[in-house]
Amino acid sequence: MARKTLRARRFFSLIFPFFFITSVYAEQTPVSAKTVTVEAKNETFAPQHPDQYQSWKATSEQSAREDALAEDPRLVILWAGYPFSRDYNKPRGHAYAVTDVRETLRTGAPKTAEDGPLPMACWSCKSPDVALLIQQEGEDGYFHGKWARGGPEIVNDLGCADCHNTASDDFAQGKPALTLSRPYAERAMEAISKPFDKAGRFDQQSMVCGQCHVEYYFDGKNKAVKFPWDEGMKVENMEQYYDAIAFSDWTNSLSKTPMLKAQHPEYETWSAGIHGKNNVTCIDCHMPKVQNAEGKLYTDHKIGNPFDNFAQTCANCHTQDKASLQKVVAERKQAIHDLKIKVEDQLVHAHFEAKAAWDAGATDAEMKPILNDIRHAQWRWDLAIASHGIHMHAPEEGLRMLGSAMDKAADARTKLARLLATKGITHEIPLPDISTKEKAQKAIGLNMQQINAEKQDFLKTVVPQWEDQARKNSLLSQ
């Protein structure tokens, strides 16, 4: 009976995907002659779908920022030389998607449309304006250039047109009209034999979230988004894919290891867990059917913790009470956290030991197998921890990946000890004080005072120009 109820609730689901002083920003050119069907302003759909819109808007209540680097300064060392060592906050409400990508230190402080450290692709999961630009310019046109180029055009937060074909008759009639608004996501699903247009309703519900909640990388000269699923979705499959094309996101500034940075692989880890294997979708747990004041059922678009809507989520399938299930989840979360910290400790030592080996005169040939072990260890660790909900989605897979990461890190440190001995170094390599985020950032040479000052200037001068330009072009409501 519970399963029938769940299926009935699923049928009506409407879903969204569950992750800057001068006048140099010229007037944007008018929309091209291509057919454009994406409406990016979410408030356009409020009269037609008031309950869904108001619940989506309520994601602004999820406003707390949690500083992951302050909580765990080891991360600064693991990401030395990469923008994540500057700033990494845990996710919050979809209503902050554009704000957060503007404000993070990772995107730098560009002064012109051609300035800054990151490519246009960094907007890809932040706004329905991305789908609009892809329709107007094509994928090659959208991905071309620096992140700052998109500032005056990508201004609306994640919303309706990211997940729904809002121009369709079905949507006008109140049906979900789910769609993959990113062509690269559609190609990725085809690579794992899941073409969207042939998928069932439940599969589509999770695939729409999987447009953004996935591992991806920036491919080619244009730095276009691609999912590394050609060999499969398991951590070893993606590792094999990246190794075959000799891809790295960056080189760790301490160990000189060509590194991989996992993003937010919820779709992959969910697929590996008990819920994914039984096709209990993202929607079932994070966007349940609820009743409005008149008793009408609608899909709650305030995406959040299933325990906040226990009766409408977990209780549809589970007979245990809320406290019992919370205890199980908390135990799994703690087990993953404990192993995560142990792996990080080994990796921190490995990066500093590798630096010591280089400083002692180690050759590329001597270091190659060691760096490969560090690369693989940190990749497996990162894929396990970058999905913040893995303790719920796939705890067994999380522990398996972390165990494998521990083995690889141990292999690297064993080889490093032997190599260092040949260089006359037999003592333990000391670590600097990395007990706080600030001390760890100082240890890798970051000038955080300058970085923060540049960012604040950018936010005060460039971002207001972006928003003014967007209003002039009717991309934002006045």
From Swiss-Prot:
Gene3D superfamilies documented for this protein: Butyryl-CoA Dehydrogenase, subunit A, domain 3 (1.20.140.10), Flavocytochrome C3, Chain A (1.10.1130.10)
Cofactor: Ca(2+); heme c
Secretion signal, residue range per the UniProt entry: 1-26
Annotated GO biological process: anaerobic electron transport chain; nitrate assimilation
Binding site for heme c 4: 282, 285-286, 393
Binding-site list for substrate: 216, 264
Reactions catalysed according to its record: 6 Fe(III)-[cytochrome c] + NH4(+) + 2 H2O = 6 Fe(II)-[cytochrome c] + nitrite + 8 H(+)
Protein name per UniProt: Cytochrome c-552
Organism name: Salmonella paratyphi A (strain AKU_12601)
Lineage: Bacteria, Pseudomonadati, Pseudomonadota, Gammaproteobacteria, Enterobacterales
Gene: nrfA
